[in-house]
Amino acid sequence: MGKYSIDPENPIKSCKARGSYLRVHFKNTRETAQAIKKMHIRKAYRYLKDVIAKKQIIPFRRFCGGVGRKAQAKAFKHTQGRWPVKSAEFLLGLLKNAESNADVKGLDVDSLVIDHIQVNRAPYMRRRTYRAHGRINPYMSSPCHIEMIVSEKEQVVPRAEEEVEVKKVSKKKLAREKLKARE
């Protein structure tokens, strides 16, 4: 079992899932992960499936050099975005894993929230491409490690409304108010 960058706040009410050396672009996966951070697990499923179907977009905020402007990104108060299908599929698989881990642990699957998600760079994978005049150039890929912690959301109980206390008014002040009311 690998080491996670943080420990969950409440280990009893949360579970973990991770993928190492995944052959999917680091930059795309990082942006996709940021889009589903702090999201309810069912909402994240829907969102990622919509991304695969190109109904919703992933806003590219950090790694946005050369990324085209899209109208769908306006929903996120941003201009640039893409539909990274492979990253969405990998994250869907990881969400399924986290959900089944929660089910085995006995947590309520419908109230799970993505508490922590982090994407780290993995070592580059090296291939080669053949160029003119007998030269060989590198053909690198940038894989990544993904870790996520999902937690059962506590039910928010509305606070009972406190009764407004009536201010105590002294006899002297009450007499003054009565006197002013007569005038």
From Swiss-Prot:
The UniProt GO MF terms for this protein read: structural constituent of ribosome
Cellular component GO terms, alphabetical: cytosolic large ribosomal subunit
Classification via InterPro entries: Ribosomal_uL22, Ribosomal_uL22_CS, Ribosomal_uL22_euk/arc, Ribosomal_uL22_sf
Instruction: Name the PROSITE patterns on file.
Output: RIBOSOMAL_L22
Key words of the record: Ribonucleoprotein, Ribosomal protein
Tell me the CDD domains matching this sequence: Ribosomal_L22
Q: Which PANTHER family match?
A: 60S RIBOSOMAL PROTEIN L17
Query: What protein does this entry describe?
Result: Large ribosomal subunit protein uL22
